[in-house]
Amino acid sequence: MIVTLVCALIVTSCWAQNAINDSTRLSSYGACIMRNDSIIGINENERFAMHSVMKFPQALCVADYLSRNGMGLDDTIVVDKADLMQDTWSPMLKRFEGEKAFTYAELLELSLGQSDNNASDLLFKYCGKPKAVEKYMRKLGFHDIHVHMTEKQMHKNPTKSIENSCTPAEMVRLLEWFYHHKDDNPYLAFIWKTMADCSTGLKRIPAAIPASARIVHKTGTGFPSPEGVQAMNDAGIILMPDGSHAIVAVFTTHSPSEAEIASIARELFEKYGLR
């Protein structure tokens, strides 16, 4: 393992230069991998719009809110379908007409597991606005994760998406924190299970991991441009069969396809000897 780590660090600067000069890639991107507290990457300290990756730090804030207020995952809120955005990605819209009671567990599963934008905004409404999420990130010690906008606000003005931003390096550090705290309480354990069962982005980092590995992750996708490209992100925890883990984050600004995320992640794994 020590030899692998040393080799990875030696080739990092050469790999980074090659990545910068890679004219075959259409996307501007930042990516990094953390293993054994060591981070290597390219543009890992640059800011990128999180898009729906934002729903991960939001979920951590929701867990803190529920815990502090003595509330359970099975507590409910009544949702009126007429109050929800109708022209956004929202699987929950197909579940009901009129009014329906949703548990916080259901809203977290919709937001994290299916990236439902209405579910995310309901969590903002009942468990703390964007500024509460950012404040919680600061409390945990993460200063390069910024949350200022709801999904509805970004939907109205897509250029505002950058106001929910992070650096790839800070996101892997937050995921590392989560890895070590996932069993602290039932809320975090539920978030872990939900992200492990995530149904989005299967052609992104999941397509690049070793066949025997598992992933706990959250994806994000921006608004498509007239040219047919869009920001695509993925960040997650890779669980290796030997019991070890690695944290990976890939953020792009105008990716032509999900396969680009897998390609970048595959390079990271190869440099770290995970393939």
Give each language-model segment a name.
Residues 84-122:
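Conserved catalytic neighborhood of penicillin-recognizing serine enzymes
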Residues 49-77, 111, 248:
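Active-site SXXK
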Residues 18-26, 39, 125-126, 130-131, ...:
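Structured C-terminal helix/loop/strand segments within mature extracytoplasmic catalytic/sensor domains
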Residues 64-84, 130, 184-188:
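Short, well-structured active-site flanking segments
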Residues 35-43, 89, 114, 246-249:
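Acidic/histidine-rich, surface-exposed loop or edge segments in extracytoplasmic proteins
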Residues 1-18:
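Bacterial Sec-dependent N-terminal signal peptides
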Residues 28, 121-182:
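Mid-domain, small-residue-enriched loop/turn segments at the edges of structured enzyme/sensor domains
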Residues 25-47:
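Short, conserved catalytic-motif segment at the N-terminal edge
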